[in-house]
Design a protein with these regions (language model features):
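Gly/Pro/Ser/Thr-rich low-complexity, intrinsically disordered segments predominantly at protein N-termini
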Residues: 1-180
Length: 180
């Protein structure tokens, strides 16, 4: 069954607080994220996706040396209407009792994409840019490349050989080895 705009004129948008309350009451039975007030079901993680995430997590954790912390597939808060769950986040060290890191705390967001490339390069890119994320990577598993976007202009750069976070250039990731 499909709906036309006349039959289904608008969506109900949830605030971050309402979304968190739904989770606390056990009403979200799947992996979800909140994007601009809309609850999105997250895709299952493929073995290749998980492996790439594990490798990147190890590389970033080895390079951290107390400069940042690595968050893997956990929420971040962006304003009052969004709580995405990127694959990896590099954020400043510190304690967040009762809250997730926000844009001011984050130096890099990484999304690994095997089935959601257009969404990650469209809606998610716009969300991260609008909310002040400083650097965003989309790891394109099918094309074995990484798309990098850096504030303030967020112009697309594509990397196939190696890449480093702009604020941590000493951490070099060999993409040929990563995708091998």
């Amino acid at each position: 069954m499909s709906f036309t705009k006349e039959q289904f004129p608008s969506l109900h948008r949830f605030s971050l607080q309402q979304y968190c309350e739904l989770g606390e009451f056990g009403l979200l039975d799947r992996r979800t994220e909140l994007l601009d007030g809309v609850i999105i079901d997250m895709e299952p993680v493929s073995p290749w996706h998980a492996n790439i995430g594990d490798i990147l997590s190890r590389i970033f954790n080895e390079g951290a040396r107390g400069r940042f912390r690595v968050r893997v597939q956990y929420p971040i808060n962006l304003g009052q209407m969004s709580q995405p769950q990127p694959d990896l986040v590099l954020y400043r060290p510190g304690m967040w009792r009762g809250q997730h890191p926000g844009a001011a705390d984050i130096s890099l967001v990484v999304q690994i994409s095997d089935s959601s490339l257009s969404f990650d390069l469209g809606e998610k890119l716009a969300l991260y840019r609008a909310n002040g994320i400083q650097e965003y990577w989309v790891v394109d598993l099918k094309a074995t490349q990484v798309h990098r976007f850096v504030a303030p202009h967020f112009k697309s750069q594509t990397f196939r050989d190696s890449i480093s976070p702009s604020v941590w250039p000493d951490i070099r990731i060999d993409l040929r080895e990563l995708f091998a």
